[in-house]
């Protein structure tokens, strides 16, 4: 795997004897100990993830939010400084180019708006090209921080208590999806109360040397290092979409059940709006639903979904997660079959296995901020 990219935390991760895997061109830890232990650490205590492979953009310019408005279905202009919005970049067909988080940082002394945007690792260059082709670079400066910064996710009900020891500012005062420019280990940092686990937590962006020191400090403080395996089971229990599996260029946010980030009534035109308006008026033909399997059969990505013996859809993600304790999956099925309680089948290695449509998310944390 010598041709793969590595994050600045790679050597530390190897020292901690992580099992490695390829992910979107990066050599990343899939697990450090047992996946179940890492998963449960995040659900009951606190864990940390190296997510430095994700794309990181810093934008600044006049009417920045107004410019970004045209690229997403969410109303970004309602954001106050220190607030963030999970949203999607859309193509003209209403398909999802990527799911992203826009962190609005406010206005500079010269009247320019500032924002950080975090994107998926596998779509960083694609997103960068799309953004630069649609933004006025005479008015907006675009800086790609992807190779310059470390990004560490500290997740779990004890994340405030564990991370606070290394942060100067009071983390308890930061709201969910809030963020600020603060101080970690006496050095500048960007800190956000966001995550991809369904638990309370923070994502911290710092310079590489600071990131290495923070990783060591958190580890010494008893924070469990976690790999991509636990990250996947955690996000799936929380029914969070994974780009290129659950959503892609050919799925719209309404099909994916992301209706809550489509703000048709409070904003003007945006790329793909006509498609979403039509889908909202007529209803989508297919929906991303949650499935619970009977027994311990695990439905995997690409497995056919059947109804009365006929293939009607496809599984996008599936696992047997530690907290839920039952095999679960996400799948696209016709709208008429998306009602909770609908019996379906999934073909697993030539065998039709029973499944039922259930409400999402599969797990809702009692500790969620």
Curated annotation (Swiss-Prot):
Give the UniProt keywords, A-Z.
Answer: Aminotransferase, Transferase
**Gene Ontology molecular function:** aminomethyltransferase activity; transaminase activity
Q: Which reactions does this protein catalyse?
A: N(6)-[(R)-S(8)-aminomethyldihydrolipoyl]-L-lysyl-[protein] + (6S)-5,6,7,8-tetrahydrofolate = N(6)-[(R)-dihydrolipoyl]-L-lysyl-[protein] + (6R)-5,10-methylene-5,6,7,8-tetrahydrofolate + NH4(+)
- At the top level, the lineage of the source is Bacteria
Can you list the GO cellular component terms from the UniProt entry? Answer: cytosol; glycine cleavage complex
Record GO biological process: glycine decarboxylation via glycine cleavage system
Q: List the EC numbers from the record.
A: 2.1.2.10
Q: Which Gene3D superfamilies match?
A: Aminomethyltransferase beta-barrel domains (3.30.70.1400), Aminomethyltransferase fragment (4.10.1250.10), Probable tRNA modification gtpase trme, domain 1 (3.30.1360.120)
- Please give the SUPFAM superfamilies that the UniProt record associates with this protein: Aminomethyltransferase beta-barrel domain, Folate-binding domain
Q: How does it assemble?
A: The glycine cleavage system is composed of four proteins: P, T, L and H.
**Similarity comment text for this entry:** Belongs to the GcvT family.
Record function comment: The glycine cleavage system catalyzes the degradation of glycine.
Checking NCBIfam families in the record gives:
gcvT, PRK00389.1
Q: Which PANTHER family match?
A: AMINOMETHYLTRANSFERASE (PTHR43757), AMINOMETHYLTRANSFERASE, MITOCHONDRIAL (PTHR43757:SF2)
Q: What is this protein called?
A: Aminomethyltransferase
In its UniProt entry, the species of origin is given as Rippkaea orientalis (strain PCC 8801 / RF-1) (Cyanothece sp. (strain PCC 8801))
Taxonomy of origin reads: Bacteria, Bacillati, Cyanobacteriota, Cyanophyceae, Oscillatoriophycideae
What gene does the UniProt entry assign to this protein?
gcvT
